UniProtKB/Swiss-Prot annotation:
Part of the ABC transporter complex RbsABC involved in ribose import. Responsible for energy coupling to the transport system. This is Ribose import ATP-binding protein RbsA. GO terms for cellular component: plasma membrane. It is an enzyme of class 7 (translocase). It comes from the Bacteria. Belongs to the ABC transporter superfamily. Ribose importer (TC 3.A.1.2.1) family. Coiled coil: none annotated. The lineage of its organism: Bacteria, Bacillati, Bacillota, Bacilli, Lactobacillales. InterPro entries: AAA+_ATPase, ABC_carbohydrate_import_ATPase, ABC_transporter-like_ATP-bd, ABC_transporter-like_CS, P-loop_NTPase. ATP binds at residues 35-42. It comes from Streptococcus agalactiae serotype III (strain NEM316).
Length: 492
């Protein structure tokens, strides 16, 4: 199948989101679609798959003009879109999810369970996965649920599969399994549109890359003929060396110290961070970094160990106690643990600091609104009206709201777990700049990240974990990717 999208434009009211887009897609090729949040990537694919029509332009499939009035029509034609937020029903079984809306019935109008099971098992076999059909899909990992979404696409004659940030919530092992499946589908002649911010994945898995910016296509190239520096510059108009802003903060005395901390999946963890210092925590998935931070913050129970702030030992058995002690914690899962998506920006930003706006039994709403608007302006949160629901913001702006929430308590120490996960390159740099400004004010920052270039580009000092223990410490000067990975895999 060959798809030609010609002169595609799209406006929502007066807001023009796509302008005169030309894009070619081909079966048997893996085509990356890159760009900052809001560049128009998902909108373009939603037009292709019939979620909404283009304002102008034409789509040709194998030379014939064609449009789809809904995604189901596109799927029946062989074009499927797996969105970042997967379309599954947690309480329903795997089999029920696979055939929801496409049930196979007997001549008597009853569900043909035997044929549906047969087709489901054939799709799983094609993907090289084994998943029970009769358990609730909510009991499965994100990686397994993603395989079910791909299997759902295979129930029709699949020609083009669009995937939006497919590895955002996957473990390293699940990511490798996904890549195996993608390569297998490519060999079968399926074309893949791979929407991602992750440079290393683009170069590992794709044949072509198209860069979008502000609703237009900037360039399309064979992936092997470009590099990270060129792609970043095309996406945001900056070179890669400008990606990590310079840090000039003066590093002071030790402000936060953890000694011999033991908990679930880790033991004997000790480290310190100074005023104005950014301490990076690196390691492979499952090394225990997140568990350490959750235990410090009182989410998980510690078995033993001490935590000190400004040389004073503190006791923390709950997140509310941690907040009272001046610890802020941006979790790796912002949507489930960091934000209340139905709440507006103002309510989310002031959740930990609501009491600060109460005086003599009266709530000072005017002061709270002014405070929130200052944070919105300072963090460059787009469409940032205080009364706007957080669920309507992009990933990068949602992450800024979580950061603002903790800045609002004037933290004595700030813990950031995967602070730029799922965030586009432009928003990433803004977050790095904000971290530097907090460090300039003397705030000690602990940053957990699985992005090795980020660890090397942002940290003053790096702790590396392996299988629940600290395996080494590196200064910024001596650290490089090889040394960090050696420690992360248990080497010395």
């Amino acid at each position: 199948m060959k798809i030609d999208m010609r002169n595609i434009s799209k406006s929502f009211g007066t807001n023009k989101v796509l302008e005169k887009i030309d894009l070619e897609l081909q079966s048997g090729q893996i085509h990356a679609l890159m760009g900052e949040n809001g560049a128009g990537k998902s909108t373009l694919m939603n037009i292709l798959t019939g979620l909404f029509p283009a304002s102008t332009g034409t789509i040709y499939i194998d030379g014939e003009e064609r449009t789809f009035s809904n995604p189901q029509e596109a799927e029946e034609f062989g074009i499927s879109f797996i969105h970042q937020e997967m379309n599954t029903w947690p309480e329903m079984t795997v089999l029920e999810n696979l055939f929801l809306g496409r049930e196979i019935k007997t001549t008597f109008g009853l569900l043909n369970q035997k044929l549906m099971r047969q087709k489901a098992l054939e799709a799983f076999k094609r993907l090289g996965v084994t998943i029970p059909l009769d358990i609730p899909i909510g009991n499965l990992s994100v990686g397994q649920q993603q395989m079910i979404e791909i299997a759902k696409s295979l129930l029709n004659q699949l020609s083009i599969l669009v995937m939006d940030e497919p590895t955002a919530a996957l473990t390293d092992r699940e990511t490798e399994n996904l890549f195996r499946v993608i390569r297998s589908l490519k060999q079968e002649g399926v074309g893949i549109v791979y929407i991602s911010h992750r440079m290393e994945e683009i170069f590992k898995i794709t044949d072509f890359v198209t860069v979008m910016r502000d609703g237009v296509i900037v360039d399309t190239k064979e992936t092997s003929l470009t590099n990270s520096d060129e792609l970043v510059k095309k996406m945001v108009g900056r070179k890669l060396e400008d990606y990590y802003p310079e840090k000039h903060s003066e590093i002071g005395p030790v402000a936060f110290e953890v000694s011999n901390l033991c908990g679930d999946n880790f033991e004997d963890v000790s480290f310190y961070v100074r005023k104005g210092e950014i301490l990076g925590f690196s390691g492979l998935m499952g090394a225990g970094r997140t568990e350490v931070m959750r235990t410090i913050f009182g989410i998980d129970k510690k078995k033993s160990g001490k935590v000190k702030i400004d040389n004073q030992e503190i006791t923390i058995t709950s997140p509310s106690q941690a907040i009272k002690q001046g610890i802020g914690f941006l979790t790796e899962n912002r949507k489930d643990e960091g934000l209340i998506l139905d709440f507006n920006i103002k309510d989310n930003m002031t959740l930990p600091s609501t009491k600060d706006f109460s005086k003599h039994g009266f709530f000072d709403e005017k002061t709270r609104t002014t405070f929130v608007q200052q944070l919105i302006n300072r963090l460059y949160i787009k469409s940032g009206r205080p009364d706007l629901e957080v669920g309507n913001l992009s990933g990068g702006n949602q992450q800024k709201v979580v950061l603002a929430k903790w800045i609002g308590i004037a933290p004595k120490v700030l813990i950031l777990d995967e602070p730029t996960r799922g965030v586009d390159v432009g928003a990433k740099r803004e977050i790095y700049q904000l971290m530097n400004e907090l460090a300039d004010r003397g705030v000690p920052i602990v940053m957990v990240s699985s992005d090795l270039p980020e660890i090397l580009g942002v940290s003053d000092r790096i702790m590396v974990m392996h299988e629940g223990r600290i395996s080494g410490e590196l200064s910024r000067k001596e650290a490089d990717q090889e040394k960090v990975m050696q420690l992360a895999t248990g080497g010395k």
